[in-house]
């Protein structure tokens, strides 16, 4: 009887192990399939872009296409250098505006603010992340564009800075608006990275005689630099891929960028505006 009981237990354990192994195999297959689908989607997008784009670029000429400074689809002239530079300038401006503000805000929320302030500011930051791009664009048209237009027309700009002929819809306006739009990403990711730094770093710095501020900026912040860098990269991705808000405030001129307060067009804006020409290529 003890032997039969032992055999029954062994069979039960074997059956459970076999079932668990089967479940594990099924879940592994499901996860592998999901990963393959994600990779396949990226591959198909690349294949579609190259299959439809390379013949057209071959007709135009790679150098004329990439380095051409004139964009006139009606005359079969397709030079995208102004849009490439426009995207780079707007993204750089957004990073200059957004990164310092976002990083300092994250440091404040992580190490300096009171719980009461956190309860107010964190939901506000999350709310900024949920606002649609077109709403940001509308805010830029109604608030930022008139403000910049009045600023460039002021006597200070004309007499002191010697800036004349500026416009409200410009590189500056687009950079400021995009800088505001990337704030939630930079603040959230940077704060998470700062909160993840072991408290021993901060306490050790205090034990060596450093002040609270020096401990935060010279011990905690360097330890979180990889997360902060990730936040900046995500902000760059958000800025360089933004379309609707930039279309509404950048002016959308297809010439080479001429100045901080002059209009320009980005790559994403050009795709939206000139979509009608794509069918005839």
List each model region and its residues.
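N-terminal signal-anchor/first transmembrane alpha helix
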Residues: 21-47
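Hydrophobic positions within alpha-helical transmembrane segments of bacterial inner-membrane proteins
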Residues: 40, 87, 91, 95-103, ...
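Periplasmic/extracellular loop-to-transmembrane helix junction in inner-membrane transport proteins
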Residues: 14, 18-25, 29, 51-94, ...
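Transmembrane-helix boundary motif in ABC transporter permease subunits
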Residues: 19, 94-125, 146
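Transmembrane alpha-helices
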Residues: 127, 131, 186-190, 197, ...
